[in-house]
Every structure is written in structure tokens, then in C-alpha cells.
């Protein structure tokens, strides 16, 4: 598989996809959710699992990375997608996206704010809190440099903290969404409460 160069896509993405297809097991019958999907899976040395899905119908190549060191121990997804050409868009542009589970802040009222686990992501592996260095190491066959080892350890520690510590979850929400501002301008005024004199 050869994919276009798109912003955010790591240079080792194609090597990873092709290596999993060649060395991994064909698990299409077990995991396919559509008719024209091809799915291969490879278990890495540390027990983590990499699954590559090629979906011909929507032009997507998806990599799912399952590791106990991911945020909330949930899978991380890297996806390259180039929509199929049609009359409205004869030359569609490809895009690369990432996704993982992460804390998300939701306001349900002026005094009601909750942190929930939901899918968060971006357009680059830099947008992930989980460490995906094992994927690069497997794809390229190269051991990480000392600088990369330190960066990867920081990332793993951060993922563990977010998974286990409420304060780290709050910090992650603020980093992604900004600080919570329950200003009264955001909520309705008047209505039945004003008519009742409250």
C-alpha cells in the first residue's frame, strides 16, 4: 500500500501498514464490519497488538494500536483516508487523522461540569497523549535514540497519569478545550423564572 504525503502523517506509516499486512495474520473474517475490507493483525514483542484495516469502499487505511500503556488502556487509531473521486470532487484530497480515548469536559449547566471519557484526536501523532513509538520501532526496525527514549517515557507517564489521576484529567481537558468559564451570558435568562418574580 502506498499513500499520499499528507500533513501530520508519519513518514513510517506506509512501512508499518505494509509490514503488518506481510507479517501479520489475516483476521478479516473475525473483524470485518463491511464487505470490501481487508484486516491484518500483528502481535508485537511487548504484547501490544497492531491491526490494519484497508477499506476499499471509503478509501481508508486504518491502524489500531492496542496497548496497556495507552490512555485508559483503550486503542489508538491512526487513519489515512482519501475519498473516492466522484462528479462533485474528481480529485479528492487525502487526510490523516488520529484518535484515542481521553477526558472531555462537558457543561450541563452553570454549576454542573463533568469530565467524561470520549474520543479525542487530531491530525498528527503529536496530538495524541498515548505513546506510539513502538509502532515506529516496528515499522522501521530501528531502535529509538536516547532523546526519543526520554520523550517516549514522558509520554507514557503522561498517559498513565491521565488514566489514573483526576487532576491530570482536568489538566488534559484544559489543554484541549481551554479553561471552563461558566459566565451567565451562556445561559438563558427571563422566561418563567422572571415572570414568577425569582
What kind of feature is each model-predicted range?
Residues 1-198:
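Short low-complexity linker/loop segments enriched in small residues
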Amino acid at each position: 500500500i502506498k499513500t499520499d504525503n499528507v500533513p501530520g502523517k508519519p513518514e513510517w506509516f506506509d512501512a508499518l501498514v505494509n509490514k503488518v499486512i506481510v507479517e501479520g495474520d489475516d483476521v478479516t473474517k473475525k473483524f470485518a464490519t463491511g464487505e470490501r475490507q481487508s484486516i491484518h493483525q500483528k502481535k508485537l514483542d511487548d504484547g501490544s497488538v497492531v491491526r490494519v484495516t484497508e477499506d476499499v469502499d471509503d478509501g481508508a487505511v486504518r491502524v489500531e494500536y492496542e496497548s496497556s500503556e495507552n490512555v485508559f488502556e483503550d486503542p489508538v487509531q491512526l487513519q489515512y483516508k482519501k475519498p473516492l473521486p466522484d462528479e462533485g470532487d474528481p480529485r479528492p484530497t487525502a487526510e490523516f487523522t488520529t484518535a484515542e480515548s481521553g477526558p472531555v469536559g462537558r457543561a450541563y449547566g452553570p454549576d454542573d461540569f463533568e469530565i467524561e471519557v470520549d474520543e479525542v484526536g487530531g491530525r498528527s501523532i503529536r496530538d495524541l497523549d498515548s505513546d506510539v513509538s513502538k509502532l515506529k520501532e516496528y515499522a522501521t526496525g530501528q531502535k529509538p535514540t536516547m532523546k526519543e527514549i526520554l520523550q517516549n517515557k514522558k509520554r507514557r507517564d503522561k498517559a498513565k497519569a491521565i488514566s489514573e489521576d483526576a487532576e491530570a484529567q482536568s489538566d488534559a481537558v484544559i489543554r484541549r478545550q481551554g479553561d471552563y468559564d461558566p459566565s451567565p451570558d451562556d445561559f438563558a435568562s427571563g422566561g418563567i423564572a422572571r415572570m414568577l418574580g425569582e
